[in-house]
Curated annotation (Swiss-Prot):
Protein known as: Metallothionein-2
UniProt region (Alpha), positions on chain: 30-61
Binding site for a divalent metal cation 2: C7, C13, C15, C26
Species name: Homo sapiens (Human)
An MF annotation (GO) of this entry: zinc ion binding
Complexes and interactors: Interacts with EOLA1.
Domain notes: Class I metallothioneins contain 2 metal-binding domains: four divalent ions are chelated within cluster A of the alpha domain and are coordinated via cysteinyl thiolate bridges to 11 cysteine ligands. Cluster B, the corresponding region within the beta domain, can ligate three divalent ions to 9 cysteines.
Gene this chain is encoded by: MT2A
UniProt binding sites for a divalent metal cation 4: C33, C34, C44, C48
Residues that hold a divalent metal cation 6 according to the record: C37, C41, C44, C60
Miscellaneous: This metallothionein binds zinc.
List of residues that carry N-acetylmethionine: M1
Amino acid sequence: MDPNCSCAAGDSCTCAGSCKCKECKCTSCKKSCCSCCPVGCAKCAQGCICKGASDKCSCCA
């Protein structure tokens, strides 16, 4: 279990706004999280958990 993620391996969970999961094994939480990400972002499609759309997103620049 990831000390920075409140879930057991394989279970579903959600990333907090700060997303400190580094080695998360959850099925619904990825290692990389974008706090803002437009729909269709290539990086988000590769595993980012998007928390909201924004035109000021830096993770897809």
